[in-house]
Amino acid sequence: MKPSSGLRGLLVLFSLTWTCAGDWSAVKVRCSYFWFYAKIKPTLFHNLYMNPDEAFLGNDCPVTYVSPDAHYEFFYYSNKCGIITKTFQETLLLQTKIKYMSSNSGDTAEMPVSCVVTQQACMYHLSNETESGDDETSSEDMEVSYIMQSQNDLNTTFSLCAK
């Protein structure tokens, strides 16, 4: 009987976690030793629509880019915005939060976000051309491209490489 009740408890816990988690595609987080990138849907908090000026990363760092697919992007150095960095042997844990602060009322909401960098990582300039796609890779020589909107509206693509 005990294994059965334990299994039921896990099932209930999983159901609650799934219900509370909502849309898993609402947040995408990537990082390296030097930068932190987050891409969020404007409806991240319980399908409440956020304007770009109401969304913040960490200690009130504003949205850096609104993408054509209506997502908000944050692209900051990992030592800015109150991002907490913890080191465990060859692993780096970056922790911060996404905040919503309504401009029309006192409503606020927060969601913790974190990102892990393992082994050695490097960042180098690839090109001035934009690349698109949300393809994931699980190879050991991981290469993930990002687009950063620069001050002069040029798209600069960077790569995270871990070996």
Curated annotation (Swiss-Prot):
Please state where this protein is localized. Answer: Secreted
Identify the Gene3D superfamilies for this entry. Answer: Zona pellucida, ZP-N domain
Q: What does this protein do?
A: May be involved in cell differentiation.
Alphabetically sorted, this entry's keywords are: Secreted, Signal
Q: Would you indicate the residue range of the signal peptide?
A: 1-21
Q: Which gene encodes it?
A: OOSP1
Organs and tissues of expression = Oocyte-specific.
Indicate the family of this protein. Answer: Belongs to the PLAC1 family.
Q: What protein does this entry describe?
A: Oocyte-secreted protein 1
Q: Name one GO cellular component term.
A: extracellular region
Which species is this UniProt entry from? Answer: Bos taurus
